[in-house]
Amino acid sequence: MIKRFLSWWRGEVQPLKRMPETYEEAVQYVYERISPDTVSHPMFHFTGGMAVRNGLGLWDRESKLHQHMLKRFGLCHADDTGMLITNAAHARKNGENYDPWPDVDRCCDHWERAGYDPRTMEKVD
């Protein structure tokens, strides 16, 4: 089942000419590669989120996209930034607007309550 939902991401889709460096470029990249059927399935946000996070290098703290997401949203965790990209592409595919800031606030609140700085993921005393 997971293979089915990751098929949109595989290399045969279209190799990257260059890695997206901004939120908008990443959203556009994902948007162009997903179908309405894919985004409407609940597994998309799990498997699709993993594919976005890993495929766009969101774990690489030196990548331009990671640095952009940190500067723009104050988040460094790849699951959080991947969720923003995935949610935006999903909304766009459905002809809806997406405001990332409520999700950003929710992520920041989660990490702060857990005792971590969402910008660095370092433990805060």
Identify what each model region corresponds to:
Residues 37-124:
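Compact alpha-helical subdomains of small soluble proteins
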